[in-house]
């Protein structure tokens, strides 16, 4: 079998400057971004793997029409839910947009919580086998016959490093790891470790053109309360009807990346009858809390970040002070 690889992408060019505003879900990123926009001529680049999809507005907490009109936004509503959007595509799009925004005399403000996108932009992407639809289809058939735990056991034989950090039912990541091995003959962990070594060598003595501001809670209970409030608001705004309309299209399945987004997966299962509708709220809140936990873990692996406690009453002022120190355009 011939092996084709996605092109390697380096981190953002050193002659570009931008500010990144990251944080877990419900940490107040949108409010902070709009506050920055009141003082600096910015254009916002969304760093959110769910906001790229059209027709997924309520469950993704997509910015309102008024918010989108107040400040130029990019990488929102650029894909149909039927089509996936990768970290490699994000890096190419973000680099292009950062350069274009800079050429317009404005500052690119990257805002979101998809940490894989941030990491890919900061550290670059090494060569990785391209997605292979045929191999993925075979894996889906095998999973239907044997179950994902069986495929997880197979992965443990060929890539124990990756298997050790994946749950036996993590279908998306197990499928990708086995796909990489079957296409290339090398485990996914091989490519990831090589990439890490390459980035250490490339970045030694270098400086980042980005300022990374990270909104992180000092009190998890505060964040959990906001998550519950937001999910309740989504349900009250017609989230279930939104998912029902997506299902009614007939061409979407629960295995698509778009439908695996937190909240959408739980709502789909409830509409399918595989999970009681009465449990949707609790399951959705729990899944969102787990997502926030993973996001915070990612953020803590980024030593260059400037942390602002999002549960501090002066959080917005602190964010603005960091931005003011970074740009002469602050007004």
Swiss-Prot record:
Gene Ontology biological process terms, A to Z: tRNA modification
Keywords noted in UniProt: ATP-binding, Magnesium, Nucleotide-binding, Transferase, tRNA processing
Signal sequence, renumbered to the chain: none
Record-listed substrate binding positions: 25-30
Cofactor field: Mg(2+)
Annotated positions for site Interaction with substrate tRNA: 114, 136
Residues the record lists as binding ATP: 23-30
Function, in words: Catalyzes the transfer of a dimethylallyl group onto the adenine at position 37 in tRNAs that read codons beginning with uridine, leading to the formation of N6-(dimethylallyl)adenosine (i(6)A).
PANTHER family (UniProt xref): TRNA DIMETHYLALLYLTRANSFERASE
The name this protein goes by in its record: tRNA dimethylallyltransferase
Gene designation: miaA
